[in-house]
């Protein structure tokens, strides 16, 4: 098992998992399943697990619709003490943006605590190749319920979370 603490401080560092899948509708359920599995291992309640599955499914479908050709969808999951951050992106043609209107966008805002989307490039996205090639990305954050806003602002969460069991 890998050590997930930093040597200098002894604090837990975020655990990160990266998936690259074709944007085919037959492959997107694998990403949804990974989101659900990670959320369960992090002790999210069952409603939050299902919310994450649905949010990831909607984000991936949205990105698949704006992706360029046969380029893969990249999804980076980062488990922290406070919750789960999911960054998903797909290469696009220059000038392509993520649609932020309609029912799908409203669903994303309802299911997670934070959602951001927009154009970027390979140099700035997690798991990117460092180039300036354009991508469309969606970032989702779902916090564990045990962390109140005051605890998050104070920076003093009360427990570590690991995705390993």
Locate predicted features.
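Ordered, soluble secondary-structure elements with a strong preference for glycine-centered loop motifs
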Residues: 25, 46, 50, 97-102
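Conserved ATP-binding N-box helix of the HATPase_c
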Residues: 45-70
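Conserved beta-strand-loop-beta-strand hairpin that lines the nucleotide-binding pocket
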Residues: 1-18, 62-165
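Helix-loop-beta hinge of the Bergerat
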Residues: 11-44
């Amino acid at each position: 098992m890998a050590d997930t603490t930093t040597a200098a401080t002894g604090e837990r560092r975020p655990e990160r998992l990266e998936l690259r899948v074709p944007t085919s509708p037959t492959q997107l359920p694998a990403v949804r399943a990974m989101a659900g599995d990670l959320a369960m291992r992090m002790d999210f309640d069952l409603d939050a697990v299902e919310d994450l599955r649905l949010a990831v499914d909607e984000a991936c479908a949205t990105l698949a619709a704006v992706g360029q050709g046969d380029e893969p969808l990249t999804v980076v999951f980062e488990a922290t003490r406070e919750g789960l951050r999911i960054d998903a992106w797909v290469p696009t043609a220059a000038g392509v943006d993520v649609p932020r209107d309609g029912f799908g966008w409203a669903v994303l805002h309802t299911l997670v605590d934070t959602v951001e989307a927009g154009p970027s490039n390979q140099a700035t996205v997690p798991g990117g190749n460092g180039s300036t090639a354009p991508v469309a990305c969606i970032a989702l954050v779902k916090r564990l319920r045990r962390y109140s806003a005051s605890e998050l602002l104070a920076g003093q969460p009360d427990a570590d979370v690991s995705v390993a069991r």
